[in-house]
Design a protein with these regions (language model features):
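Elongated, mostly alpha-helical coiled-coil "stalk/stator" tethers of large membrane protein machines
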Residues: 1-181
Length: 181
């Protein structure tokens, strides 16, 4: 239920941001606010049904002030606080990013590799992501993960393409164990 609810709020906020011409900035603000409310100090406020609405609203306003949030995001946070729905903020931010990516015709790809990639290797993987998604605009994030042993893992919109040596070795080990019994 919270996924659907978060998506509905995200659609509404996207519409407001579109009208204001603040699509990207609103997404950044939502992600900052979601990360802030997910901090251990504020998490009890988000999850506790015993905290009254006035206290949640005061805290939400304080966070909005500290983060310098726009009126659109500030009002959203106040509404979520009033309705004791601040817990959906991380999902709402993810939905917003996803809807915004769709609207702007772009895709996100997370690239994990065992070693640092050269510019040519990175560009080749981005080109692969373009072919797989059919989108020309690709937002990429790279990460080195030595535990992969070799190869790369691509996460494109939640679909994982695992070409790591670690996974290949695990698959081979499993096949050998099953074949040997």
């Amino acid at each position: 239920m919270t996924g659907r609810l978060a998506k509905r709020y995200a659609r509404a906020v996207l519409g407001l941001a579109r009208e204001d011409g603040t699509l990207e900035a609103t997404g950044e603000e939502l992600n900052r606010a979601a990360a802030t409310f997910d901090e251990p100090r504020l998490r009890p406020l988000v999850l506790s049904p015993v905290i009254d609405a006035a206290a949640r609203l005061r805290t939400a306003a304080g966070v909005a002030d500290a983060l310098g949030l726009s009126p659109t995001v500030r009002n959203l946070i106040a509404l979520l606080a009033e309705r004791n729905r601040l817990a959906i903020l991380p999902d709402l931010a993810r939905w917003y990013d996803s809807l915004l990516d769709d609207e702007l015709g772009r895709a996100r790809v997370a690239i994990r590799s065992a070693t640092t990639l050269s510019a040519a290797e990175r560009n080749e993987l981005i080109e692969l992501a373009r072919r797989l998604t059919g989108r020309q605009k690709i937002l990429s994030a790279t990460e080195v993960d030595a535990e992969l042993l070799g190869g790369v893992v691509l996460d494109i919109g939640g679909t994982v393409y695992d070409g790591s040596l670690r996974t290949q070795l695990a698959r081979l080990t499993k096949e050998m164990a099953e074949g040997g019994s």
